[in-house]
From Swiss-Prot:
Native species: Clostridium acetobutylicum (strain ATCC 824 / DSM 792 / JCM 1419 / IAM 19013 / LMG 5710 / NBRC 13948 / NRRL B-527 / VKM B-1787 / 2291 / W)
UniProt name for this protein: Single-stranded DNA-binding protein 3
Disordered: annotated span: 112-144
Biased amino acid composition, Polar residues: 112-134
Signal peptide positions (record): none
PROSITE patterns in alphabetical order: SSB
GO cellular component: nucleoid
Gene Ontology MF terms in the entry: single-stranded DNA binding
Length: 144
């Protein structure tokens, strides 16, 4: 089994690229994930590289920015490549299968989307519509 679940903060804005040929979106970013234990009263964090593909990559790049809290679930993957100096380099990263935006907003001027989500509330909770437009249903009308 290869399954990872993380909650952390973005260390910088996600970097969005598109693959040559197919044009598939891929976003990469680093999550700062707090450790459970404090060393000498100081909170320590691990900085974990994340890669996300497709529509989730585009959404992540559009709506998330440095410092925002997000959740990621996926798998650990190790890959290698040849560097310009001729040495072989190894990279261990998380390939995200699911991302959750735990804080909204972006420095890329996406405040309109954030305002629509928040629906005008300062605390970020959504307002439910008034019940004036709801038609009452008789239990006898339900087929089960």
């Amino acid at each position: 089994m290869n399954k990872v679940v993380l909650i952390g903060r973005l260390t910088k804005d996600p970097e969005l690229k598109f693959t040559p040929g197919t044009g598939t979106a891929v976003a990469s970013f680093t999550l700062a994930v707090d450790r459970r234990f404090k060393k000498e009263g100081q909170q320590e964090a691990d900085f974990i590289p994340i890669v996300v593909w497709g529509k989730q990559a585009e959404s992540t790049a559009n709506y998330m920015s440095k410092g925002k809290l997000m959740g990621v679930s996926g798998r650990i993957q190790t890959r290698s490549y040849d560097a310009k100096d001729g040495t072989r380099r190894y990279v261990t990263e998380i390939v995200a299968e699911e991302v959750q935006f735990l804080e909204w907003g972006s420095s890329n001027n996406n405040s309109m989307a954030n305002d629509q989500f928040n629906n005008g509330n300062e605390n970020g909770s959504m307002q439910l519509p008034d019940n004036n437009d709801i038609t009452p249903i008789d239990d006898g009308d339900i087929p089960f």
